[in-house]
Amino acid sequence: MNKAPHETRVVVGMSGGVDSSVAALLLKEQGYDVIGIFMKNWDDTDENGVCTATEDYEDVVRVCNQIGIPYYAVNFEKQYWDKVFTYFLNEYKAGRTPNPDVMCNKEIKFKAFLEHAMSIGADYVATGHYARVEFRDGEYKMLRGADPNKDQTYFLNQLGQAQLSKVMFPIGHLQKADVRRIAKEAGLATAGKKDSTGICFIGERDFKEFLSHYLPAQPGVMKTLDGEVKGRHDGVMYYTIGQRHGLGIGGSGEPWFVVGKDVRENVLYVAQGFENEYLYSTSLKAVDVNWVSDRKPEAPFRCTAKFRYRQPDIGVMVHPLADGKAEVVFDAPARAVTPGQAVVFYNGDECLGGGTIDEVFRNGEKLWYVG
């Protein structure tokens, strides 16, 4: 960074939450030329769900006025629908369980929003993500957020050098409790606002009910892998691998879990027991693999990986393949590894990149996850 802070324009993506509020506050206190932008990515008149976009924007206005920075809203609804929501629906139709937050970061926050910010003279964009960027050895490294319970690098695995060179994560070095404390001490309107846990920009709705607006129910049978019918389901797209709630299978003994889907035959496969062998896999194939360094490793390498957010890292051997693919072999069998979710690679605190889980195997045999 060659310019002095007061000559450096940073455009902050503000959601109306405490994290992005404190990110903007810290940048302002450090002397940057800060602008707050609220991204409107969802048309809340589309269906009858509850959308909090209006009150979130009001919170952004309040916080920006308190901090003393200009603000406005930008509409990315079309890009969100085309790049994120359409992908989300198509993946569910195919029987997979997508991660829209990964796609939202890739296509909206660090593409459409980044491009908009650059068009208004920004030097950098900033967000309230719990992640860190360091420049060393001639390249940008993405590191886990200092708060292990809040680290969000899992969702940022598709970022590369072009984005990281233009991104600041002002709260990445802080614990969540410190962020709340800073907001409270500054009297920010969002200091006590609870964190959102819903899908990126869709909010806190009943998921199955929400999905049914776009993917109508397709009832079918629920079977064991031996072919015994255990009940009926509303549509395989409403269920995910490892799910136990909402199956409606009674009886004694351990609970039942979803272990597979056959989309063509509209069959949901279930098995009994927390440790059922069909819940476990030993390797996967990933597609759309991104390397943060922008360089595909030339040889297989050892690292750790996550197959879902907040999961402890497990040791793996990664075999990079052509066409953005990779084979990942686990040190120990892993439970409920799910096609459509992200697999993300780490070397200590450094996030190396990640991809989308495409196929899952147990001892070389492809599991019954998608027909």
From Swiss-Prot:
SUPFAM superfamilies referenced in this protein's UniProt entry, alphabetically: Adenine nucleotide alpha hydrolases-like
Keyword Translocase in record: no
Source domain of life: Bacteria
Region of interest (Interaction with target base in tRNA), ranges: 99-101
Pfam families: tRNA_Me_trans (PF03054), tRNA_Me_trans_C (PF20258), tRNA_Me_trans_M (PF20259)
Disulfide bonds: 104-200
UniProt site positions, description: Interaction with tRNA: 129, 341
Compartments, as annotated in UniProt: Cytoplasm
Assigned EC number: 2.8.1.13
One Gene Ontology cellular component annotation held by this UniProt entry: cytoplasm
Molecular functions per Gene Ontology: ATP binding; tRNA binding; tRNA-uridine 2-sulfurtransferase activity
Catalytic activity: S-sulfanyl-L-cysteinyl-[protein] + uridine(34) in tRNA + AH2 + ATP = 2-thiouridine(34) in tRNA + L-cysteinyl-[protein] + A + AMP + diphosphate + H(+)
Similarity comment: family membership: Belongs to the MnmA/TRMU family.
Functional description taken from the UniProt entry: Catalyzes the 2-thiolation of uridine at the wobble position (U34) of tRNA, leading to the formation of s(2)U34.
Entries under PANTHER family matching the protein: MITOCHONDRIAL TRNA-SPECIFIC 2-THIOURIDYLASE 1, TRNA 5-METHYLAMINOMETHYL-2-THIOURIDYLATE -METHYLTRANSFERASE
Name of the protein: tRNA-specific 2-thiouridylase MnmA
Species, as recorded: Geobacillus thermodenitrificans (strain NG80-2)
Upper taxonomic lineage: Bacteria, Bacillati, Bacillota, Bacilli, Bacillales
